[in-house]
């Protein structure tokens, strides 16, 4: 057994007071790894620098960042008390916390730091479109814009979240640049209706369609609308539609109208021609008449037929041949029905002054009489020496007497009677009448108004 003086249980009471005194004497020196801050006491020769090369704080590791530490002067360990560390985040990450950490006496660094991935502002969803991103709005995420059908992308299609937390390029938008679609109908050539120069043409109005939102704001038609009567010729029809973006779509087509024609007819010599419609188109009717003193021979009217040939025969105007050999006055008047007007001048003797003066005035106004289809009939004398004369033709005394009796013309005095084309007694005179007064009367007759229009078209006039 060993010496009793070396037994531990015997030495402990003697050593313990010495250890306590030692701890009391050196409180400013600290203990490596204790975390206690040393006291700066000039009276103690132990210096803080004694522990400057002793690991103190835990090593720093920053995810997605780099740490650059500087140990206290003369030190080696970069976790010693007083070590300063600069923190830098890698590209695309940003520092949250202090950019410089100091190893403190409490064995803790002066701050907690973290490198977080940078994030760009959330992109605005474009109207009528959208976008798709690889990694949301984080750094280096790539987003691609797209547009709904009918819309066109305006701006950059692809943007990337950059290191400055901004997106590359400007935000894109979706605009309606595509014009609306419209399809016009196909209208075949049309033939004008009978006796007309037009034809009614109808079609279904085209319906436009917008490729974007399907909404059209306006439809404009240039040309005649469907259901109109189109005249002969080539007609351009144009439809224009607009969408809400003011894009326009247009379609065009033509309506061609053809008039079937028989060829122009001419008025007969010494006659008139009055035609309906355009005068030679399918269904047109041409009516013919002759000037005073002439009779119509041939067809009084001709029609342009579907085979483009005129009906009837070609008319002509022949000088009127009055038959004075008829047996009755009525038969004589029938020859003038709807052809001529009559001015019957009756006198008991050729020496009658009123008769002679009146006949002289009528001879000077012969053009006006012919223009108004007036035939002068002279009844001179008293039966049985009565003479009836129509220009160069002499009627029998008995026929002349019948005419006086039929029209109730006085036998023994000067008298004049105006008879219209329907055989009606229109006016009587017992004294002289000027040609102008006579013409003014005749010009009021219903048939005369139509004649005046035709004569004006033909250029037939007189100075009286």
Curated annotation (Swiss-Prot):
Superkingdom classification of source: Eukaryota
Report the residue ranges that make up the HYR domain in this protein. 177-259
Coiled-coil positions are: none
What InterPro entries is this protein classified in?
A: DUF4174 (IPR025232), HYR_dom (IPR003410), SRPX-like (IPR043555), Sushi/SCR/CCP_sf (IPR035976), Sushi_SCR_CCP_dom (IPR000436)
CDD domains, A to Z: CCP (cd00033)
Disulfide links within the chain: 57-85, 69-103, 89-115, 120-161, 147-174, 262-304, 290-317
Protein's GO biological process = autophagy; negative regulation of cell proliferation involved in contact inhibition; phagolysosome assembly; positive regulation of extrinsic apoptotic signaling pathway in absence of ligand; response to endoplasmic reticulum stress
Sushi domain residues: 57-117, 118-176, 260-319
Listed SMART domains:
CCP
What are its GO cellular component terms? autophagosome; endoplasmic reticulum
- Glycosylation, residue list: 34
Keywords, sorted A to Z = Disulfide bond, Glycoprotein, Proteoglycan, Repeat, Signal, Sushi
Can the keyword Magnesium be found in this entry's annotation? no
Spell out the SUPFAM superfamilies in the cross-references: Complement control module/SCR domain
Instruction: Tell me the first and last residues of the signal peptide.
Output: 1-30
Presence of keyword Disulfide bond: yes
The record's PANTHER family line, in alphabetical order, gives: HYR DOMAIN-CONTAINING PROTEIN, SUSHI REPEAT-CONTAINING PROTEIN SRPX
- Provide the protein name: Sushi-repeat-containing protein SRPX
According to its UniProt entry, this protein's organism is: Mus musculus (Mouse)
Gene name linked to the record: Srpx
């Amino acid at each position: 057994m060993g010496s009793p003086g070396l037994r531990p249980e015997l030495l402990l009471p003697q050593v313990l007071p010495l250890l306590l005194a030692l701890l009391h004497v050196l409180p400013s020196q600290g203990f490596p790894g204790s975390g206690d801050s040393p006291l700066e006491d000039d009276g103690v020769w132990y210096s803080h620098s004694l522990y400057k090369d002793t690991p103190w704080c835990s090593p720093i590791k920053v995810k997605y960042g780099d740490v650059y530490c500087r140990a206290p002067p003369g030190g080696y360990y970069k976790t010693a008390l007083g070590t300063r560390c600069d923190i830098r985040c890698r590209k695309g990450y940003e520092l949250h916390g202090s950019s410089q950490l100091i190893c403190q006496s409490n064995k803790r660094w002066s701050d907690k730091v973290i490198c977080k991935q940078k994030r760009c502002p959330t992109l605005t969803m474009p109207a009528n479109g959208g976008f798709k991103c690889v990694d949301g709005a984080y750094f280096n995420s790539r987003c691609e814009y797209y547009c709904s059908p009918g819309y066109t992308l305006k701006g950059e299609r692809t943007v990337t979240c950059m290191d400055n937390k901004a997106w590359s390029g400007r935000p894109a938008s979706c605009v309606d640049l595509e014009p609306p679609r419209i399809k016009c109908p196909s209208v075949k050539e049309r033939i004008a209706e009978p006796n007309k120069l037009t034809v009614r043409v109808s079609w279904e109005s085209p319906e436009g369609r917008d490729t974007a939102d399907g909404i059209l704001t306006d439809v404009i038609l240039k040309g005649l609308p469907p259901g109109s009567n189109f005249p002969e010729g080539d007609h351009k029809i144009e439809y224009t539609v607009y969408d809400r973006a003011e894009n326009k779509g247009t379609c065009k087509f033509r309506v061609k109208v053809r008039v079937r024609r028989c060829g122009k007819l001419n008025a007969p010599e010494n006659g008139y021609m009055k035609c309906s419609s355009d005068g030679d188109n399918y269904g047109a009717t041409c009516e013919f008449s002759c000037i005073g003193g002439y009779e119509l021979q041939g067809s009084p009217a001709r029609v342009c037929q579907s085979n483009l040939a005129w009906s009837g025969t070609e008319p002509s105007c022949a000088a009127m041949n009055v038959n004075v050999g008829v047996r009755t006055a009525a038969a004589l008047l029938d020859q003038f029905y709807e052809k001529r007007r009559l001015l019957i001048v009756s006198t008991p003797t050729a020496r009658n002054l009123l008769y002679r003066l009146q006949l002289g005035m009528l001879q000077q106004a012969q053009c006006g009489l012919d223009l108004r289809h007036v035939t002068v009939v002279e009844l001179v004398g008293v039966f049985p020496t009565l003479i009836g004369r129509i220009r160069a033709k002499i009627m029998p005394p008995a026929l002349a007497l019948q005419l006086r009796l039929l029209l109730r013309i006085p036998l023994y005095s000067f008298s004049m009677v105006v008879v219209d084309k329907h055989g009606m007694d229109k006016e009587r005179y017992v004294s002289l009448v000027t040609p102008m007064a006579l013409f003014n009367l005749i010009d009021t007759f219903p048939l005369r108004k139509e004649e005046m229009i035709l004569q004006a078209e033909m250029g037939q006039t007189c100075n009286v």
